[in-house]
A protein has these predicted regions:
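Hydrophobic alpha-helical transmembrane segments of multi-pass integral membrane proteins
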Residues: 54-57, 81-85, 99, 104-156, ...
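Glycine-/small-residue-enriched transmembrane alpha-helix faces in small-molecule transporters
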Residues: 7, 11, 56, 60-63, ...
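Hydrophobic transmembrane alpha-helices of multi-pass small-molecule transport proteins
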Residues: 50-69, 203-221
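Specific transmembrane alpha-helical segments of multi-pass solute transporters/efflux pumps
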Residues: 1-23, 64, 156-172
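Membrane-interface helix-cap regions at the ends of transmembrane helices
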Residues: 7-10, 60-76, 119-147, 193-194, ...
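Helix-helix packing/entry segments at the starts of transmembrane helices
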Residues: 25-30, 100-119, 158-194
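Hydrophobic/small/kink-forming positions within alpha-helical transmembrane segments
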Residues: 2, 6-10, 32-37, 94, ...
């Protein structure tokens, strides 16, 4: 759980910072496919036709919402480090959700501690390695007063999100958790529209409908 949580955060955030966000998110949200396979191996959960239908609907919705204006040529760009990191992040996130469910007999405090330790440990190791290699600059501690409120706010948001995730993931089948998590794509798109960073077009409506249908099927299975 420590390794899975830490790798998820480090890989996904690194990928977003260096790659095309649309492409990274789309590759990351292949996560339900990994979840179905890992759940079969680690939890002996059956792969039912309904589970496959929910995964297909969710991925179709994500593809429609995230399809770039440039068309298929943008999705077919050369495979990059960001692409690899996005795939690693999605696989690790699926493994994280399954491990949370597998360790559901442990206290929520223990699971939360493992996730936070993993996030800090793996991200710290990656940061130190990249700084030593000269790929990223050292933090500007003299200007800490300018960025620490934002850092504190983000930390609080991550805390709330992780607590909600482990509460739900420990009580739901892994494949259902994976598909429900796809609603993040819809929420992100809607937030962009509300903040004036996007428009409410046919693609968003159609893709959002697919994602909501997938989540609805998961909730009522």
């Amino acid at each position: 759980l420590i390794a899975a949580a830490g790798t998820t955060n480090a890989a996904f955030n690194w990928a977003v910072s260096i790659g095309d966000v649309v492409r990274v998110v789309l590759l990351f949200y292949l996560m339900p496919l990994w979840a179905v396979l890992l759940a079969r191996v680690l939890l002996q959960e059956a792969i039912t036709p309904r589970a496959l239908l929910r995964v297909a609907l969710g991925l179709l919705g994500a593809l429609i919402v995230l399809w770039p204006p440039e068309g298929a040529t943008a999705l077919g760009a050369a495979f990059s480090l960001a692409d690899a990191l996005a795939l690693i992040g999605g696989f690790s996130f699926a493994l994280n959700n399954i491990m949370v469910r597998r360790e559901q007999d442990r206290s929520e405090a223990a699971r939360a501690a493992a996730m936070f330790i993993g996030g800090a440990l793996v991200a710290g190791m990656v940061g130190v390695a990249l700084q030593a290699a000269g790929s990223i600059p050292a933090p500007l501690w003299r200007d800490a007063s300018q960025w620490w409120p934002w850092a504190a706010g983000l930390s609080a948001a991550f805390l709330a999100a992780n607590l909600c995730l482990q509460f739900g993931a420990s009580r739901l089948p892994a494949h259902r958790t994976a598909v429900i998590m796809l609603t993040e794509v819809l929420f992100a798109s809607a937030s962009a529209v509300a903040l004036g960073a996007g428009t409410l077009g046919p693609a968003l409506l159609l893709g959002g409908a697919c994602i909501l249908a997938s989540a609805w099927l998961a909730a009522w299975d």
